[in-house]
């Protein structure tokens, strides 16, 4: 039985590269995090404090994988149909897809994201 399960698990096709040039921006418990896919790798974009104020910071988080239902980035799983974000079993959020880097970059409107901040 275990052998059957292992053979079944490893025969499921997993792909990368098919979403290169596209990105998603997710809202996870009020925080904004984006992932842009290029060269079979995922790059994480977050808003962080810089020298003169908030800025978007890029970090290579490694290879990504896809199947017909999900995108996998390390311990993150994103449903391709409804763009639901899940990290481990507790961190959840919603994402929006972008077809190219310019539209993806435009999704990080820092002024709009902080307009309701009290301090």
Language-model segment annotations:
Residues 1-2:
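Bacterial N-terminal signal peptides that target proteins for export
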Residues 11-13:
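N-terminal signal peptide c-region/cleavage motif recognized by signal peptidases
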Residues 18-32, 95:
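Tryptophan-anchored aromatic micro-motifs
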Residues 27-49:
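N-terminal targeting signals for Sec/Tat export/insertion, comprising classic cleavable signal peptides
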Residues 32, 50-82, 88-101:
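Contiguous, well-ordered beta-strand patches that form the walls/edges
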Residues 46, 86-87, 112-113:
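Extended soluble regions of mature proteins
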Residues 90-119:
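C-terminal partner/receptor-binding element of secreted or periplasmic proteins
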């Amino acid at each position: 039985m275990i052998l059957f399960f292992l053979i079944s698990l490893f025969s499921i096709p997993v792909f990368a590269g098919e979403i290169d040039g596209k990105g998603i921006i997710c809202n996870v418990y009020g925080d904004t995090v984006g992932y842009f896919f290029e060269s079979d790798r995922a790059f994480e974009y977050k808003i962080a404090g810089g020298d003169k104020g908030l800025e978007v910071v890029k970090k290579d988080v490694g290879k990504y994988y896809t199947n017909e239902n999900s995108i996998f980035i390390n311990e993150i799983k994103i449903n391709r149909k409804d763009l639901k974000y899940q990290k481990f079993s507790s961190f959840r959020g919603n994402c929006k897809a972008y077809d190219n880097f310019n539209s993806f970059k435009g999704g990080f409107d820092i002024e709009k994201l902080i307009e309701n901040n009290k301090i």
